[in-house]
Amino acid sequence: HVKAIPGADPELVERMGYLADRMSVNLELPTAEGLRTLAPNKHRKNILTPMRQIQNGIHANKEELILYRKSPVFVSGGQSTQMIIGATPETDYQILNVAENLYQKFELKRVFYSAFVKVNEDKSLPALPGGPPLLREHRLYQADWLLRFYGFKAEELLDEKRPFFNVMLDPKEDWAVRHLECFPVEINRA
């Protein structure tokens, strides 16, 4: 697994793609606003450009492999990214929408979520009186699973009126409680 650095030389990204089974470019924060606030030297375009290059490389390589079976494989395991959760004010709904868009537009295999942990006393970093939002991170992983493997859409799980998960309920359980009209289910037809 290789992490491509935003703004990396495209030639290096391509060369690494033939050596690594997976590549990732960390999105860092869910929105461009959050990035401007906490990492003003980083720009969304510099993050998305290598993501697009990796996606295009995977597609081109699939075509090469059809024509030339012995061609080297480019990023066989696909690409992923990571977002820090809780450092900026994005809602779970916004975060899931970002993840959903990344899956659709960049064909990512996985989005990783990392609860923000304050490691120094920089005044620009938010104070988290309750500590890192680990349970929130866990609920986002569970919701992400619903997006990737069960075909849910972010808007089916959350919306503008209800933008955060109830951290006391698994998102699947939360959805079921809000959609009692779908139950009971005949197990042989489910």
Identify the meaning behind each predicted range:
Residues 158-174:
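Long, charged amphipathic helices and adjacent flexible linkers at domain junctions
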Residues 172, 178-190:
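Helix-hairpin-helix
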